[in-house]
């Protein structure tokens, strides 16, 4: 195997672990999982978890198994000024179609803490008519490391207002 360089700014050893695959999936509801790039790189674990679709919310992470899973990639960075709201509808559709087809969907970013959590919280809010606090509480109860950045939290709070306005 080639030497792993510190591409992700987490040290060579941690970069190696992330690329080899992890097993820290959090099932938020039936068929909907949050994880990190480590889980996205663990083909056998994804298959054993009935994952059929993978939604990547990160830059520079090409789908590792395009012949085995249906992928959607949203290339965004984890910064407060990044506008994730423009992707909420297409992510909602991707997640919902995966679940409706009887499969499972992994939503992941790099660490499974901010971008992926934001997308899943937005999905829950729209799908189940949940408020931001209730959806965030549900996600955190199943994934303790769920901490969207302050900009994403603000976007989710605004999204809640827009959903309530359409009700």
UniProtKB/Swiss-Prot annotation:
Its main location: nucleus. The gene is DSPTP1B. GO terms for biological process: cellular response to oxidative stress; intracellular signal transduction; negative regulation of MAP kinase activity; negative regulation of plant-type hypersensitive response; response to oxidative stress; response to ozone. Has a dual specificity toward Ser/Thr and Tyr-containing proteins. Prevents biotic and abiotic stress responses, including ozone, oxidative stress and pathogen attacks; represses MAPK activities during hypersensitive response to limit the spread of the HR response after infection by necrotrophic pathogen such as Botrytis cinerea. May be also involved in ABA and salt responses. Dephosphorylates MPK3 and MPK6. It is found in: Nucleus; Cytoplasm. Expressed in flowers, seedlings, roots, leaves, and seeds. Present in stomata and meristematic cells. Belongs to the protein-tyrosine phosphatase family. Non-receptor class dual specificity subfamily. Keywords: Cytoplasm, Hydrolase, Hypersensitive response elicitation, Nucleus, Protein phosphatase. The lineage of its organism: Eukaryota, Viridiplantae, Streptophyta, Embryophyta, Tracheophyta. It is an enzyme of class 3 (hydrolase). Induction: Accumulates in response to stress conditions caused by abscisic acid (ABA) or salt treatment. One of its GO terms (molecular function) is protein serine/threonine phosphatase activity. It catalyses: O-phospho-L-tyrosyl-[protein] + H2O = L-tyrosyl-[protein] + phosphate; O-phospho-L-seryl-[protein] + H2O = L-seryl-[protein] + phosphate; O-phospho-L-threonyl-[protein] + H2O = L-threonyl-[protein] + phosphate. PANTHER family: DUAL SPECIFICITY PROTEIN PHOSPHATASE (PTHR10159), DUAL SPECIFICITY PROTEIN PHOSPHATASE 1B (PTHR10159:SF503). Associates with MPK3 and MPK6. Interacts with MPK6 is promoted during HR-like responses triggered by fungal elicitors, whereas interaction with MPK3 in repressed. InterPro entries: Dual-sp_phosphatase_cat-dom, Prot-tyrosine_phosphatase-like, Tyr_Pase_dom, TYR_PHOSPHATASE_DUAL_dom. The active site is at 109 (phosphocysteine intermediate). Residues 24-165 form the Tyrosine-protein phosphatase domain. One of its GO terms (cellular component) is plasma membrane. This is Dual specificity protein phosphatase 1B. Disruption phenotype: Delayed wilting symptoms in response to Ralstonia solanacearum and, by contrast, acceleration of disease progression during Botrytis cinerea infection, suggesting that this phosphatase plays differential functions in biotrophic versus necrotrophic pathogen-induced responses. Prolonged MPK3 and MPK6 activation during ozone treatment. Its EC number is 3.1.3.16, 3.1.3.48. SMART domains: DSPc.
